[in-house]
Amino acid sequence: MSLPYVLILFYSRTEGTQNLALHMARGVDQVDGIEPRLRTVPPVSAVSERTAPSVPDDGAVLCTKDDLIGCSGLALGSATRFGNMAAPLKYFLDTTADLWAGHHLVGKP
């Protein structure tokens, strides 16, 4: 059986937010009995369509709904755009409405 994990989900066009996510992962890794799981989301086009997800060569892999369902805790990271999170992260979260409606994320800090 695998350890419970904190899902560290981020979007970073530059390395700033990604570096913060890596530091968070190091902190989670210091706690016995839980592990970090770094995930990112694919970019979206200027017309808010999902672009074809590219599998990153290195760094965090793309997040799936199963990552959200299985996590014991969730940390989100994104640069802000006009007071909101970056569009790719918002788009991904908008696609998880079925998880919210199905109560799959209840009780996850």
Task: Go through the PLM ranges and name each one.
Residues 1-105:
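N-terminal beta1-alpha1-beta2 submodule of the flavodoxin-like/Rossmannoid cofactor-binding fold
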Residues 107-109:
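Short, intrinsically disordered, charge-balanced linker/junction segments flanking boundaries
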